[in-house]
Each structure stands twice: as structure tokens, then as C-alpha cells.
UniProtKB/Swiss-Prot annotation:
Its EC number is 1.4.99.-. It comes from the Bacteria. InterPro entries: DadA (IPR023080), FAD-dep_OxRdtase (IPR006076), FAD/NAD-bd_sf (IPR036188). This is D-amino acid dehydrogenase. The keyword Magnesium does not apply. Keywords: FAD, Flavoprotein, Oxidoreductase. Its cofactor is FAD.
């Protein structure tokens, strides 16, 4: 079967890998000049199944109101005359109940755990290198109240058999020795030893190279204009290269997926949530993190990537605006200065922003659509890197007519019907 994938981010390329492994003829089209040049380019770098949680949670509406008055807020709302923005926020608020949070987190952990296992298998199969480390994730708490709020998350981790450790301050420093120089009080942390780190952009580039060696074609610099349809079937993709035809199509365009899908009557509830990152050259190994530390206070991830530190975070609802804002850089810098002072050359750091494709319930949209040969693999939010291999394998099995290894019906877009 000939399969055309729209999008060459980490999710699209992972999907291409698994489809090609099943013997399909695979073509990937993307407007950029190489793989992983959008959201996958400089994300926070963690592969964190245990930390997979929906943003929609009990208490979040009140937290957002408080955050909006803070100078180093992890959340920024730039209101627009945009029905999609307000509809998405309304749907997200509807998921801020205890029952919805438990349901959505369970979905996310299920897929993320599966994805981590698929990533390990892929690494064994290919020998791919991407500055990866298997040293776990440490969710760091500055207050006792933050620690007390982990009970529900721990219950979900237990239900899925996810390993975890509750640490006091000394335990946090034992796991991350650089924290001994922290400039702020530390109460404790939740360590997830099964989590990993790695450079998502490097992984995507290397996996694309492996795909090319296996016969996958990449059409870079290709603008996607829309779909041609006949009844319940996609007949072609209209593009800057003309009509691109295949037997099956996969939309893996991240935040841009809903703009294309609405042309054929599919309302994908995905909204771009801008995130920022800094990549800092390490100047003192002893002061630097060894893996990923999640600063719970500011919702910022500080990750070791080879001889660099990647600091990523903030959530800015500003539509498709990717402009860099220096006040967000100050937020990132503040966290790394407080937790890992003198670890890197901050003036030499690169500053980046990208759009995370967020769904209201935090769970990606994977599976079929009303068009029998169009499939979705999109809406992974902040967890595209964490969920990429599992999502790719899952959809490849579905397209190939194989029974997937995990439950998947609740990941399809049909959950938003009505």
C-alpha cells in the first residue's frame, strides 16, 4: 500500500518508520526543508511516561488566575477574536474535573509507557544515537503543598505499575547532585526512574535518514493546500508539487492539522500553545543536571542533552504567533539560575519558541476519520517526543490491519463527536 504522511516532525517520521517496516511504500511531505523543524526542533528533551499528565486538572482554573498576576507566570493568555481559542478553552475547562483528569491521565500514561518501550526497541534495532540518557525524571517541589498534591498522580502510577520514588531534599540532591547549590528552598521530589532524555530534533533527523535508507521518500519544501475527495474517500492531496496520490493518508501536521482538516468538515479540537526553550552550553559539569528536573513551581523542565542544558516551558495562548518574547526568556533563566547556578553560559544560550498542538483533554488524536483512507496522528501537546514511537507503531498497526498491542479506541477523534 502507498501511504502519504503529511508532516515530518517526530510523530510523522516515527509513523513513516513503522509503516515502512510493515512493507508499505511511504512518502512524507512537509513544507520545511528538513525533518523536525517545527515543534520537534528544540523541545524540553524529556521522554517522560510517568510525568504524562493533562493540563486540564482540578484547581487549574484558579491557578491560572493566580499565574496571570505573576511576573514569572508559567501561563500567558493573549486573548484574540478567535472562536477556536475560546471554544478550546471552554472544552479544556470542561475537563478540569477529578473524573475527567483521572480518565485522561490514564490514557496518556498508557500510550506513553507503550511509546517508551517502542523507543527502546527501535534503539536496539537501529543503533540510533540522539544524546539520550536513561537517568529518570525528578519532579521538584519547593513547597510541602506541592508534594501533598501528588497523591492522585501516584495512584495512577501505581495502577500502571510505573516505578516511582518519593524523595526528601537529601534524596533529590543524591539523584541530582547539582541541586546542592540551589538558591531556593527544596522540600522534596517525585522521581520517575524509568523516564529518559534525548534530543528530539537529532532523533527525528537520524530516524528520517534511516527511513530514507529503507526506501521512504521525503518531499521537503512542499506546501500542502488541501484535500481532493470523492464520497468517503480522499483521492489526492493538493500541493505545490501538484496532486499527490496514495492509497492511504496520514495527517501529522501538529498545530496546523485543524487548519487543513476543517476544509473537509473535520473539526479537530487542537489549539497551538506556544512554548519556549533555551539551549545553554555547559560550563561546569558539577553544577549541571544529569537528567531532567521538572520545576513544579514554574512548570519548567531543565534537561541534560550531552554538553548542553535544555530549559523549556511556559504556555502561551497566542494563536499561531511564534515571535520570541524576552520576558519569557527571563522566566526560563530564573529557574535554571535558582536550581543550577553557574552551570552554563547563559549569554551564549540560544532562544527558541514552538507551537504545541494541544487538545482540550491532553490526549492525542490517533486513528481513523469519516474518510475511510484518512488517518490522524496529531494533538500530542507537550508530549510528542514522549509519545512519538508508540503513536507511530499504533497507527501503523491500524493501517496494516493488525491488532494493536494497547487499547486505542478512546484515542480516536470520535471521542469528540457531538
Amino acid at each position: 500500500m502507498r501511504v502519504l504522511i503529511l508532516g515530518s516532525g517526530v510523530v510523522g517520521v516515527a509513523t513513516a518508520y513503522y509503516l515502512s517496516r510493515e512493507g508499505h511504500e511511504v512518502v512524507v511531505a512537509d513544507r520545511r526543508d528538513g525533518p523536525g523543524m517545527e515543534t520537534s526542533f528544540a523541545n524540553a528533551g524529556q521522554v517522560s511516561p510517568g510525568y504524562s499528565s493533562p493540563w486540564a486538572a482540578p484547581g487549574i482554573p484558579l491557578k491560572v488566575l493566580r499565574w496571570m498576576t505573576q511576573p514569572r507566570s508559567p501561563f500567558v493568555l493573549r486573548p484574540k477574536l478567535d472562536w477556536a481559542q475560546w471554544r478550546w478553552m471552554t472544552q479544556m475547562l470542561g475537563n478540569c474535573t477529578a473524573n475527567a483528569y483521572a480518565r485522561n491521565k490514564a490514557r496518556m500514561v498508557r500510550l506513553a509507557e507503550y511509546s517508551r518501550d517502542q523507543l527502546r526497541d527501535l534503539r536496539d534495532e537501529t543503533g540510533i544515537a540522539y544524546d539520550n540518557r536513561e537517568r529518570g525524571t525528578l519532579q521538584l517541589f519547593r513547597t510541602q503543598k506541592q508534594m501533598d498534591h501528588t497523591a492522585d498522580d501516584i495512584a495512577v502510577l501505581k495502577s500502571y505499575g510505573v516505578a516511582y520514588e518519593v524523595l526528601d531534599r537529601a534524596g533529590c540532591i543524591a539523584a541530582e547532585p547539582g541541586l546542592q547549590w540551589a538558591q531556593v528552598p527544596l522540600v522534596g521530589g517525585l522521581r520517575l526512574p524509568g523516564d529518559e532524555t534525548g534530543d528530539a530534533h537529532l532523533f527525528t533527523r537520524e530516524l528520517a535518514r534511516i527511513c530514507m535508507e529503507r526506501g521512504v521518500s521525503f518531499l521537503f519544501g512542499t506546501q500542502i493546500h488541501g484535500f481532493s475527495t470523492q464520497g468517503d474517500k480522499i483521492t489526492a492531496i493538493r500541493s505545490s508539487r501538484g496532486d499527490l496520490m496514495a492509497d492511504a493518508y496520514v495527517c501529522a501536521l501538529g498545530s496546523y492539522s485543524p487548519l487543513l482538516l476543517k476544509q473537509i468538515g473535520i473539526a479537530a479540537p487542537i489549539y497551538p500553545v506556544k512554548g519556549y526553550s533555551m539551549t545553554i552550553p555547559i560550563t561546569d559539569e558539577t553544577h549541571a543536571p544529569v537528567s531532567t528536573v521538572m520545576d513544579e513551581t514554574y512548570k519548567i523542565a531543565i534537561t541534560r542533552l550531552g554538553n548542553r542544558i535544555r530549559v523549556g516551558g511556559t504556555a502561551e495562548l497566542a494563536g499561531y504567533d511564534t515571535r520570541l518574547r524576552q520576558e519569557r526568556r527571563m522566566t526560563l533563566e530564573g529557574s535554571v539560575k535558582e536550581l543550577f547556578p553557574d552551570s552554563g553560559d547563559l549569554p551564549a544560550a540560544t532562544f527558541w519558541s514552538g507551537l504545541r498542538p494541544m487538545t482540550p483533554d491532553g490526549t492525542p488524536i490517533i486513528g481513523p476519520t469519516r474518510y475511510r483512507n484518512l488517518h490522524l496522528n496529531t494533538g500530542h501537546g507537550t508530549l510528542g517526543w514522549t509519545m512519538s514511537c508508540g503513536s507511530g507503531r499504533l497507527l501503523a498497526d491500524m493501517i496494516s490491519g493488525k491488532r494493536p498491542n494497547i487499547d486505542h479506541a478512546d484515542l480516536a477523534i470520535a471521542r469528540y463527536a457531538g
